[in-house]
Structure formats: C-alpha cells, structure tokens
C-alpha cells in the first residue's frame, strides 16, 4: 500500500511536469496536445499515469468490498497474476496486427478485473470455512459479486458489439471469450454462495448441498470446455495455433473428465447403498465408538462398511462424493472389480466347504452368531488368502513351473540364458511357493471359532 502511494505520487509529479513543459513551450492548447501525443517520452509518462489511475480505482474497489486482504488471498493473487500475464503475452503475439495503445489498455483492464474475481472466489471460500461471519461481511461479498457480474455483462456486451461491427475475428473475439468465462465463473460463485447460505439457515442439516454443488461444478466445467473449444477452433482457423489456450483447454478437459468419472462412480456406489452397506446392529454401536468421524456427532443408526467402520448414512453419502476410501482406515469402500473376479476365480474347495458349513449352521440361533464370527475371522485373512491363491495360480501357469506342457516353451524362449541364472530363478520361485503353501495350510486349519461353531451346530 505504501509502495503504491509512493509510485502514484512520483507518477503524478512527472505528469504535472510534462504538462507544464508542453503548455509553457507551445503556448496554446492545440499545439501542446499535439506535442504531448507525438513525443515518445511524454506519451510514456501519460500512459504511466493512466496505469496509476486504474490501479488506484482497483484498490478503491478492493477496500470498499473486501477490506484488507489475508495472506492466502495475496499469495493467490500473485500466483495467478504471473501465470495470467504470461498467457496474455502469448495472446498479444496472435493479435499483433491489432496492437495499439487501446489494445494495451483493454488487456490491463482485463487483468485487473480477473484479479477482482480471484479475490472474490478466495473470500467466498474463506467465508464458507469460517464458523462465525458478521452480517457486514455477507453484505459486502454479495454486493461485490453482483458488481462483478454486472461489470462482466457490460464488458461482454461491448465486446460483442465491436465484434458485430468489425464482422471479422479480431481482438474482440478474445475479450468476448474472456468476459464470458468470467461471467459464468461469477454466476457459479454466486450460486455456490447461495447453497452455503441455505445450508447455514438449515443449521448445517441440508443433505442436498453436496449433490447440488457437484452438479453446479459439473455444468460450469462443461460450459467452460465448450467455450474453450469454440474459441480454440476460431483462432486456429483465422490466426493459427493459439499457444496460450493449450494449457487452459487441457486443464478444463481434465477437470471435466475427473468430475464425470467421480459422478459415475458416485452414482454406482450410492444407487444401492441399503443393499451394499448393511445397517449396524445395536451391539455394534455399543461395542464401538458411536461417534461419526465425519460429522463428530453421536450415532443412533449407522451404515457399516466392509472394513467394519460405522458412519451416518448421509455423512457417508456426502463423503463418497469426494472420496472412494474409508475416512478412518483409507480402505476402498468398494473393492476393485479385478480383485473380486480374481478371488471368485481362485476360490478353493476348502473355502466352498467352509461357506456350505456356515450356511448349514445358520439355521440355528446360536449357530448363526458363531458362523458370523467365523466369517468375520475369515475376512481378516481373506486378503492374504487371495494373494496366495493368485500367486499359486500364476506360478502354475508360468514357464518356470516344471511340467511337460511348458518344457518346449522354456527351452525355446530361454535357451540363451545361462544355466546358473535359470537355476537361481527356479530356486527363488520354489522358495516363494513354499512360503505361500505354508500360509495356505495355516489358513486351512480350523480356528477356535470354527471348532465352537461346529460343536454348536452338532449339538443343535
């Protein structure tokens, strides 16, 4: 702030000196203005004064609507400003035939308006994460967003009018596209803020807020991607390859692809939550911590994940919109399809007999509880069992496994390898399969829970 005041004071002093020299040396108004507009030094000083006036107006708007900036907002502003400046310099090279003082003024105006949008977005994010916000802060941010939306609409309308009058792809296309992007971004910020206010009025109990926010961001990214594609094709057909749009186009496409993938995954998981995730029993709620780790509130009813952790159904639904893992242990909420198919394909006779025994003993009341404990005990070793079975099946199909079916393949494909290396590989794999076989034997031994289950079933 102090540096801006010093810079503005020196620029004002230089401008006054230049104007005084022009009128004192020329004596009349018209010769003095011609001298000021034709002299390069005078023109640079006057343009610098115009930049000072724009920065002063920008700073005034910031003070009125936002007040003092936080450190995170200043950091965001500096990062975005340098990146946007490089992209604008690339854009200037495309529209070099339209390069003039007016074009530079419009570019500086665009950069300053983008800075206001960045600060508005960051301030809304800060308000959403702050527990107590004053009424004045809400009024200022709402007024600021409405001001930005009106400004975006006016500048978009002006750029479209210039584009219609010129009837060709010129710098008006660039500014029209930029202000349309800013307008859609401002609308999305306003709607997102409205969602926040609605949730605040409902005391944080609006379960539909994450869903509507997700749809809003999906539609916003779709609109941005469509506009980027149209502008890219228009510039490419009239001027050449727009280098400054490649990064924005790629990031927008990547964000849209990620959101569509997350949406499909979310719909797949939440389509049958009641069937996929069972309800927690009162015994499970009493034996475990009955506090939901997502909302930090007590649970009277909850859903149980595969890993055994309990959560509110609406908290779990909100969490699954962003993550596919358990909030507590980071295990996958839904196992991968390839792991499931591998486990089903490598299911051994012992596992099938164990499932049959469990199903037989479930007819009795006590036998059902014991079989449930046995299945829970088996689930703890299921991952190791699947890994061992998969490794055994892979080893059996490999060329190292000694069988008559793969002798020819081994001799043809590895005839050039030294015998010492072949023997070392064979001994290593044989030791690994021996370890896996021992693990399988340990898993096949009946545990204490299984023995009790069998005795209870026999007694019944």
Curated annotation (Swiss-Prot):
Q: Which residues lie on this side of the membrane: Lumenal?
A: 25-40, 120-140, 192-225
Against Pfam families, the record matches this protein to: zf-RING_2
Region called Disordered, residue ranges:
339-378
Please state the pathway this protein functions in, per its UniProt record.
Protein modification; protein ubiquitination
Predominantly, its location class is endoplasmic reticulum
SMART domains, per database record: RING
Molecular function GO labels: transferase activity; zinc ion binding
Any stretches that span the bilayer, and where are they? 4-24, 41-61, 99-119, 141-161, 171-191, 226-246
- How does the UniProt record describe the way this protein sits in the membrane? Multi-pass membrane protein
The record's comment on protein family reads: Belongs to the HRD1 family.
Protein name per Swiss-Prot or TrEMBL:
ERAD-associated E3 ubiquitin-protein ligase HRD1B
Report the source organism.
Arabidopsis thaliana (Mouse-ear cress)
**UniProt lineage:** Eukaryota, Viridiplantae, Streptophyta, Embryophyta, Tracheophyta
